[in-house]
Amino acid sequence: MRQFGALRGGRRGLLGCPAGDRGLGGVPRRPLPKGSTSPTLSIYTKNHFFYIMSFMKELELKYGCNPNQKPARVFMENGDLPITVVNGRPGYINLLDALNGWQLVKELKEATGLPAATSFKHVSPAGAAVGLPLSDTLKKIYFTDNVELTPLACAYARARGADRMSSFGDFISLSDECDEATALLIKKEVSDGVIAPGYSEKALEILKAKKNGNYCVIQIDPNYVPAELERKQVFGVTFEQGHNFLKIDEKSAFSNIVTKNKTLSEDDKRNLIISLIVLKYTQSNSVCFVKDGQAIGIGAGQQSRVHCTRLAGQKADNWWLRQSPQVLGLQFVDGIKRADRDNAIDVYIGEEYMDVLAEGKWKNIFKVKPEVFTREAKAEWIAKNTNVALGSDAFFPFGDNIDRAKKSGVTVIAQPGGSVRDDLVIEAADGYGMVMAFNGIRLFHH
């Protein structure tokens, strides 16, 4: 049988009995997840929740991308699905997020040796991170003050906290067994669901109580490997391609450094690898800023490369501004919800700050009316950010991307190269003393 967090001996053939039969030790089988084609079995022990994954060849869905797109299902042409729905009922987009997010965190864990988490929305990550300890400032802006944090919980707090506006209502992917500390963080956030290779007994109890018992919890077989060929249909036309098994590591990511400055610290290397793995599962065009083991700005799905860089840079700036004394000192009214506080901060540090500072409005949000966070003060604070890594899923065609990256503290870059203006892009990077690698790896994802 299969234990959450580990593989155990036994046979899934035990599930051939009728759904009404009693399982091992006389424990009744759980009701079938809706859409499942076979029964499942759950057993509790002192520390873990045991769950036998069902022979699930397909899963019926309520609808596809939109309510009018019926019928809908996910299925395997050959073999069983590598997932089991433990609780709730995932939707079409939930599963797209879950399966893309799982690949991302699995590869982050393999590349760094650290637990990893990602927060997905509409088939792109809003945040992704590995489990490095949090500073006191990060604990405050991630709402984890005075909370016990495991490495996996740190990874999730970072992934969720980088772009809280975009992560609202996300689908979470975890590289490791979900522990109680991580589940307690998830419990407090607005989220659609989570996928992980396992769950501790306490974590599962916490998650199953979320959303009035409807929170989506998915277990994935960590040893599942997809077929070498993958297919999808568009307008009735079938597309086929080889699965992207490209491994991103130190050798592939930045062995060809083209700038005068060629010095990369171990932190730089890890951050660049993280940025590229994130891009591998982000809708193109995409650019990713990473600092201290977490994505701090992801620009996804833009037709223009420089707009990717601007979008990711703005998100990185907002993440950094949230750590400024002026924002940390904001005094919110008692009982304000997290989402309202996140929105107020986002508006306050932006150009439309009067929307929260105007008379008749600020008293609904703040105990004390804040001073305007001026452009000059924001620029001064942003200039203090440094040691940021930048990855791009395709080449930079112009040096303006480098100029914009510099404004958000970028010091190291990994990109494919291959532009007819590579010499000008290198010249721009050299002008700032940056390290830039041409890795020849395009990471388009659609």
Residue locations for each model-derived region?
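Active-site loops and adjacent core secondary-structure elements that bind or stabilize anionic groups
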Residues: 45-250, 268-286
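Glycine- and Gly-Pro-enriched alpha-helical subdomains that act as flexible
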Residues: 126-164, 296-395
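Long, charged amphipathic helices and adjacent flexible linkers at domain junctions
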Residues: 218-264, 324-336, 342, 368-369
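C-terminal binding/interaction regions
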Residues: 174-175, 188-217, 224, 385-390, ...
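Flexible, glycine/charged-enriched surface loops at secondary-structure junctions
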Residues: 111-119, 217-220, 284-291, 321-332, ...
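Gly-rich Lys/Arg/Thr-decorated short loops/hinges at beta-loop-alpha junctions or inter-strand turns
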Residues: 77-89, 162-168, 242-262, 340-362, ...
